Design a protein with these regions (language model features):
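Adenylate-forming
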Residues: 9-12, 33, 37, 44, ...
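AMP-dependent adenylate-forming
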Residues: 7-29
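Short beta-strand elements of ligand-binding domains
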Residues: 59, 82-83, 105-106, 121-131
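ANL superfamily AMP-binding
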Residues: 18, 31-56, 86-88, 92, ...
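Conserved ATP-dependent adenylate/AMP-binding module captured primarily in the ANL superfamily
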Residues: 86-116, 135-141
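Conserved pre-ATP/AMP-binding loop-to-beta segment of ANL
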Residues: 17, 142-161
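Residue-level detector of anion-binding/catalytic polar loops
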Residues: 78, 101, 123
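Conserved AMP-binding/adenylate-forming
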Residues: 26, 42-86
Length: 163
């Protein structure tokens, strides 16, 4: 069994030096993006992520946020994006319902989310739009390559709450 989503979308280009992402201040090749996702995936697994575990994310868009999505899929997790405009009561509902093992949020929102994460037993990490935070600090401690965790075609890749 393979990880069909990661293998179909990201793996075919993993070693390419061609530019994958263009940002205002840098260009990122497929290979550099893969190395970044490998470090994040290894970090998630080291923190206890198992196949099917949820990773809830309420953070501003950035390259690292996109890499977190790819890394979650690669590590066999289920990505749970949460709108940055949700109130603490809404977050309490969504996090209580989904029961993620990890929660990623901005430093500014961490104070409100910390008691919720503690109540559900989730690891709390921070990630700001400038890519600073405990997630980036923890990820640099890990090296790749990271082999994608096998997932079946019926396994979840993401959970999207709607209004």
């Amino acid at each position: 069994m393979s990880n069909h989503l990661y293998d179909g979308v990201f793996a075919p280009h993993a070693d390419s030096t061609k530019t994958f992402l263009y940002t205002a201040d840098r260009d990122i090749s497929f290979a550099k993006f893969t190395a970044l996702t490998d470090r994040i995936a290894a970090m998630l697994v080291a923190q206890g992520l198992a196949p099917g575990d949820r990773v809830a994310v309420q953070a501003d868009k950035s390259v690292l946020l996109f890499a977190l999505y790819a890394a979650t899929v690669k590590a066999g997790g289920v990505y749970l994006p949460l709108n940055t405009g949700y109130t603490p009561a809404e977050l309490d509902y969504f996090l209580g319902d989904a029961k993620p093992g990890s929660v990623v949020t901005s430093n500014a929102a961490a104070e409100a989310i910390t008691p919720i994460a503690a109540r559900i037993g989730a690891v709390l990490m921070t990630l700001d739009s400038d890519e600073s935070g405990s997630l980036s600090e923890a990820a640099v401690q890990h090296e790749g390559p990271f082999t994608a965790v096998p997932r079946g075609s019926e396994d979840l890749a993401a959970i999207l709450y709607t209004s």
